[in-house]
């Protein structure tokens, strides 16, 4: 067992024996390590530790999960233990109900995939439904059990999230892309400042969503465990209070798109239709601000270009050229 994980589990569960830990799949985030935990009493959980000793991300995720548990607008995994101020900051959660969307997706036909995406869209609309007074970075829980935020104008919060992307990125090969994206945000500050404020997940991907079987939908037990749409988001460490349009653009990109290509229109339409059906429309100003967020999304390629090389099994220089070309195209569209 990793020494940091052992330290965290020993502090979190001093009277509970661990049978073993196990891997949970690859991650492109080098700032944290997450392992599955099998306890000797038969229980299971997932332990996330901050490998650099910085408890900021743990504090953020812990606060959001406690907030969701109190609000119950949508469900998140149950917190078993957590301490962002420990020598090894940690968060331990219970397994989320249902199956990881990545696996469910691979086994589903087109009709069910569209239905799943409508449910994801509805879940995001539910998350975004509660307005916040201002944008900001989440730093913990407040005295009333809500979210403690460092308030700032939305363009500044957006810049801060871009900085976080750079911190967890795995390659500086395309470092100039960050400067280009920062310049784009600054040039469009006035366009961005009018955005509404809502809680954003910040990293909607198939591995970060769990889907409960449709058969349970509509029951009280189903809604308690998995929210009204049977979709449970996990991994909230990148959550922030920002423009719902940004969350939706990122969700479409990470759920459906390739390195420099878009997924099938019918899938994107299903995601947005689910959102519209729940919210009555897309976030205000979505079309106006979307091109800026498309530029920001390029950093999910640029900052992890080495990971994409392995994932796509293509030469690095080839992907660098494609990324440069795609960024220019997106900047021209703003």
Question: Predicted regions span which residues?
Answer:
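A glycine-centered beta->alpha junction motif in the catalytic cores
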Residues: 95-108, 162-164, 298-314
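ATP/Mg2+ or Mg2+-diphosphate-binding catalytic cores
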Residues: 300-334
């Amino acid at each position: 067992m990793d020494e940091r994980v052992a330290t965290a589990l020993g502090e979190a569960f001093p009277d509970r024996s661990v049978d073993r830990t196990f891997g949970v799949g690859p991650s492109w985030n080098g700032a944290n390590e997450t392992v599955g935990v099998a306890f000797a009493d038969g229980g299971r959980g997932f332990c996330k530790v901050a490998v650099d000793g910085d408890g900021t991300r743990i504090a953020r995720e812990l606060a959001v999960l406690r907030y969701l548990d109190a609000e119950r607008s949508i469900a998140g995994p149950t917190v078993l233990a957590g301490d962002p101020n420990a020598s090894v900051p940690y968060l331990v959660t219970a397994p989320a109900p249902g199956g990881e969307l990545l696996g469910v997706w691979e086994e589903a036909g087109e009709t069910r995939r569209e239905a799943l995406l409508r449910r994801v869209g509805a879940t995001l609309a539910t998350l975004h439904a509660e307005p916040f007074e201002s944008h900001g970075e989440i730093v913990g829980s407040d005295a009333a059990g809500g979210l403690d935020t460092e308030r700032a104008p939305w363009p500044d919060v957006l810049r801060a999230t871009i900085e976080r992307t750079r911190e967890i990125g795995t390659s500086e090969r395309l470092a100039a892309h960050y400067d280009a994206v920062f310049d784009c945000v600054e040039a469009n500050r006035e366009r961005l400042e009018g955005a509404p404020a809502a809680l954003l997940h910040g990293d909607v991907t198939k591995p970060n969503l769990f889907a409960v079987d449709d058969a349970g939908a509509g029951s009280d037990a189903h809604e308690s465990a998995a929210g009204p749409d049977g979709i449970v988001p996990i991994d909230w460490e990148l959550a922030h209070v920002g423009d719902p349009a940004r969350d939706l653009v990122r969700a479409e990109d990470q759920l459906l798109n390739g390195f420099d290509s878009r997924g099938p229109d019918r899938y994107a339409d299903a995601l947005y239709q689910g959102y519209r059906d729940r919210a009555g429309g897309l976030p205000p100003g979505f079309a106006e601000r979307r091109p800026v967020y498309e530029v920001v999304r390029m950093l999910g390629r640029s900052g992890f270009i080495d990971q994409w090389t392995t994932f796509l099994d293509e030469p690095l220089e080839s992907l660098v050229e494609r990324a440069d070309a795609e960024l220019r195209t997106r900047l021209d569209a703003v």
